Amino acid sequence: MEVRFKISNFSKCLLAVLCFLIGITEGRESYIAVESYSGKIVLELNADKRRPVASLTKIATAMVVLDWAKLSGTSMAEIAIVPQGTSLIGGFNPMGLIPGDRISLREAMYSMLLGSDNVAAATLADHAGRSIQSRSGGLSPEAAFVTEMNNLARGLGMQQTRFVNSHGMDGSRSQGISTARDMARLAIYAMRNPGFQFYVKQTVRTISSFRFNQKRSFKVRNTHAMI
């Protein structure tokens, strides 16, 4: 099932309309358009129908990382190591990251949000999760991070949402679930964060990682068709 996410800003007062299209096949659409500052719903269809959340998961991943970095005083220049097991995730990996590569949190965020990079998402979750892990009762870094994603969802009133990983790829036994209405709540929260706004508004970015002390540079282009 294909999932698409659209955000656009219009008018002099920067009124943001957030539209979510989930399941583009006939008869299976779900969408909602919301004025982000007033909360007024402009239109909706099947907005409470639960659907696989797929790559929209990365919005929650980004916000948990940004909130954690702010609360912990962690610099986004801090270096993370790509964890073991990421080669099994599948899907987008535009930088060709492999376990052991080193990348800053900032560069990983760019690759995740602009290039829908699943390995970058897992790397961010692993790095932040190791800090969160100390108060999570023995969970793995990824599991501790996903717990925070679901805590964020509950805090935003996303009652029909369940995240199962940091990247949105379906697992063999589970998949993340949400609704257009719930994702609107998350997107409004994200777009009110200046850091998140800055990342997603970039059209192209040259980013770097390190492998065996050799710098590897890439241009990551925004996969959002409206940018």
Q: Residue ranges of each PLM-predicted region?
A:
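Domain-terminus/edge residues, biased toward the C-terminal soluble/receptor-binding domains
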Residues: 162, 174-182, 187-227
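Non-catalytic cell-wall polysaccharide-engagement segments
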Residues: 2, 148, 152, 223
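Bacterial N-terminal signal peptides
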Residues: 12-22
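Active-site-adjacent loops and short helices of periplasmic peptidoglycan-processing enzymes
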Residues: 22-181, 191
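Intrinsically disordered, low-complexity regions enriched in small/polar residues
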Residues: 7, 22, 33, 39, ...
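Bacterial N-terminal signal peptides that target proteins for export
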Residues: 2-14
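Alpha-helical structural motif
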Residues: 13-14, 145, 192, 219
